[in-house]
Amino acid sequence: MVKVLIVDDSASVRLFLQGLLAADPGIEVIGTAADGDEAVEAVARLNPDVVTMDIYMPRMNGLLATRRIMETHPVPIVVVSGNLDAEEVASTFRAIEAGAVTALPRPQGPGHPNHEREARSFVQAVKLMAEVKVIKRWPRRDNPASLPSLPCQAMVPARLKAVAIGASTGGPMVLQTILAGLRRDFPLPVLIVQHMATGFIKGFVEWLNLTSALPVHIAGNGDRLIPGHAYVAPDCFHMLVTEDGTAIELQNTPPENGLRPSVSALFRSVTQAFGAQTVGVLLTGMGSDGARELKRLREAGAVTIVQDRESSVIHGMPGEALKLGAATHTLPPDRIVTALTSLAMEK
């Protein structure tokens, strides 16, 4: 049974979310809170498995409450956004920076044509967050260790042409770390698929640009791949590269692994376009999206990196890749930065 605490200043929203969640036999709503102060107290008293957190509340807002909870009684926090305007989405990513594990839009109410679908997705996502038993943070090293010597079969035979990264739950903070750590003269385009609820990608890219050494863009169909730029897959489209490897191709073909955009689609595409001249990176997240395709990328001669268990919020995707023998390296985020820099700067 997953124990959930609902935090929202609106009594009607609390009642709505409570009805959605309590209807699932695997969930028990153990309490509600109307502001951040109440939330901090309730977490300490009730010890929930998951907290759903509103952002805009009186007294202590959701951002401060998230920070306080993560300092005192760490628990998976899901930011629930009722309004996807720029200000609220920006605040949502500040809450993720403070320790929230993911963000979800609040489902539409009864009578809306999307209500049942959105409600099912919301409830399932909240339940899955209970798998995040401990919120981990990785140490920042002033002098990161150098990349271990590459095994012969992983040596890149020619100059690299692209980096492809896939991430899910816990990915935003890791991607922020990687993009902030790369040099401004990083000589490769970086292609990113981050699983995220619809409506948050624009704010996610804006948030990344606050700290990234590279310009970060929402990928557009036909965009030319420019070295030293990062491209994030947009909502509802698979992101591929053209056969000649010069541009981005967006496709609305069926979801893969239940997902669109899919990491699998990106990895398969870069394997075809670049082969061994790619670095593939699979970060924290649940499920197995991208794992088999990362193995194929390794078999093509590419360097393939997965995030280590200790620094992953959920080690599902990287763990599946390791089981398949898909990784040439298993590294924490700061050493992924070191590895990418070392590989890209090789002459």
From Swiss-Prot:
Reactions this protein catalyses: [protein]-L-glutamate 5-O-methyl ester + H2O = L-glutamyl-[protein] + methanol + H(+); L-glutaminyl-[protein] + H2O = L-glutamyl-[protein] + NH4(+)
Domain notes: Contains a C-terminal catalytic domain, and an N-terminal region which modulates catalytic activity.
Gene Ontology process terms (BP): chemotaxis
Keyword Phosphoprotein: yes
Family matches, as Pfam families: CheB_methylest (PF01339), Response_reg (PF00072)
The protein, known as: Protein-glutamate methylesterase/protein-glutamine glutaminase 4
UniProt function note: Involved in chemotaxis. Part of a chemotaxis signal transduction system that modulates chemotaxis in response to various stimuli. Catalyzes the demethylation of specific methylglutamate residues introduced into the chemoreceptors (methyl-accepting chemotaxis proteins or MCP) by CheR. Also mediates the irreversible deamidation of specific glutamine residues to glutamic acid.
Modified residues (4-aspartylphosphate): 54
Location within or outside the cell: Cytoplasm
Organism, scientific name: Geobacter metallireducens (strain ATCC 53774 / DSM 7210 / GS-15)
Active site: 168, 195, 289
Chief place where the protein resides: cytoplasm
